[in-house]
Amino acid sequence: LQLHYQETGKPYIDGNNAISFSHSGNYTALMITQSKSAGIDIEMTDRNIEAGIDYFLNTNEIAFLSQQKKNLHALTCWCIKEAAIKYFNVSGIDFKNCIHIQPFELLNLGMPTVLIQHSQEEMIKICYRREKDFLLAYTVD
């Protein structure tokens, strides 16, 4: 397989396959699918992002965060938004005001709805999975 990059930085391979990849700590996530687009993100669960949530979460999203597991819930939202960006192949988008996650309960597995506003509004479902030391979020069409 030959790996190429679009002008936006999104990777692609020859043929009709979509590809997305991510890395965090010692983990790498790779998705290859025959769908038109794919987005995947992986994050280490020990990453502390609570102090920066105002940068990437809007007030509605901050309001639904679990108070007992606020950092983990915020990190899950970050992971979901990263997967959405990769899926839609947009760069320079405002994470806080252009990507909206519908309220969801923090579980080990979930599939919240995400609204992204760029050239047009689109809604997708993004799956997430939590393991002992990492989070994985992904979507395909």
Predicted regions and their residues:
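Core catalytic alpha/beta fold that binds nucleotide/phospho-ligands
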Residues: L1-D141
